[in-house]
């Protein structure tokens, strides 16, 4: 299971509960991604619209429950990301140099590496 959160503490708390539920149902949490993270503005300053540290809070919260996982990335909130989403166009295809697109690509690469080592079936059976 890939846990996605935002920087806000409440969202991180919900994400910890989702990760805990995943583990209780026999699934593994392969990583945490923070969406809507800080953006770096043209003048070099950082804009944390929704705060920061949500992904790290999820990893810490899961660790307190003996669940080991890692932060795979922080997807920044960018104007092009919102525009691409509104138009139904994948950001990585339309604006590959956008910081959000670059981070999405890094997260995808990390997921490929993590899942390529596994060929597992879910521990589920029909009723």
Where are these regions (language model features)?
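Acyltransferase
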Residues: 99-114
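Residue-level detector of alpha-helical recognition elements and their boundaries
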Residues: 16, 30, 96, 119-122
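C-terminal boundary of histidine-terminating zinc-finger modules
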Residues: 85-102
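Conserved catalytic-core segment of NTP-binding enzymes
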Residues: 1-74, 79-83
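A short, charged, Gly/Pro-tolerant segment at domain boundaries
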Residues: 106-110, 119-127
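Secondary-structure transition/hinge residues
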Residues: 26, 112-119
